[in-house]
C-alpha cells in the first residue's frame, strides 16, 4: 500500500516500509530534521548507486517533503490520498531517571514536545483511505484518548491501528 509517514524524523520507519515494497512519502516539518534526512538519503543514494541496487530500489520508493503534515494532508486531492497514514509522534517525556537514547535526546532538544499530535490523528483519519497506524510507547495513553480498532504490541512499543470504513 501507498504510505504517508506524517512524522518522518530520521526516516527509519519509512525505510523499513519501503524495503517491504511500500511507496512512502515522508513529511517532516522541522527544517533541521528535514535537512538531516535529506542529506542521509543523498548519501545513501550516492553510495548505493555504485554498490547496491537493492538500496537504490528502496530509495526510489521514498519521497521526502518538508511541510507541516496536517497542512500537507489537507491539500491532497482524493486521487492522491494514501491508503495508510503512519504517525510516530514524539514520545511523551520519560518519568524514569534513565536518559533516552542519544539520537532521541537530540530530537527532544530540537522538537521539544508534539503539542499537536492529537489533532494530527484526526487529520490523518480524514486523509487515509484505509487506516491510520500510530506508533506509541507500550504504556502510553492512546493518542487523543481515542481507542484504536486493534493494537499490535511489542516489548517497548505498540502500534495502534485505526480503520476507516
Describe every region a protein language model picked out:
Residues 8-10, 31, 71, 90-92, ...:
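Short, glycine/acidic-enriched loop or turn micro-motifs at the edges of active sites
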Residues 1-9:
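Conserved class I S-adenosyl-L-methionine
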Residues 1, 83, 130:
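Conserved acidic residues
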Residues 89-120:
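Mobile active-site "lid"/loop adjacent to the S-adenosyl-L-methionine
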Residues 117-163:
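Conserved Class I SAM-dependent methyltransferase catalytic core
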Residues 27-84:
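S-adenosyl-L-methionine
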Amino acid at each position: 500500500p501507498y504510505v504517508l509517514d506524517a512524522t518522518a524524523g530520521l526516516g527509519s520507519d519509512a525505510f523499513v516500509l519501503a524495503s517491504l515494497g511500500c511507496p512512502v512519502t515522508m513529511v517532516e516539518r522541522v527544517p533541521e530534521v528535514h535537512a538531516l534526512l535529506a542529506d542521509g538519503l543523498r548519501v545513501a543514494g550516492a553510495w548505493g548507486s555504485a554498490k547496491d541496487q537493492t538500496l537504490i530500489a528502496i530509495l526510489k520508493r521514498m519521497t521526502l517533503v518538508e511541510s507541516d503534515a496536517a497542512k500537507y494532508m489537507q491539500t491532497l486531492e482524493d486521487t492522491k490520498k494514501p491508503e495508510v497514514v503512519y504517525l510516530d509522534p514524539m514520545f511523551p517525556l520519560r518519568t524514569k531517571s534513565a536518559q533516552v537514547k542519544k539520537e532521541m535526546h537530540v530530537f527532544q532538544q530540537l522538537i521539544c514536545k508534539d503539542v499537536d499530535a492529537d489533532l494530527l490523528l484526526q487529520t490523518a483519519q480524514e486523509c487515509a483511505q484505509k487506516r491510520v497506524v500510530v506508533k506509541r510507547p507500550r504504556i502510553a495513553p492512546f493518542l487523543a484518548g481515542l481507542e484504536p480498532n486493534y493494537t499490535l504490541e511489542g516489548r517497548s512499543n505498540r502500534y495502534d491501528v485505526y480503520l476507516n470504513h
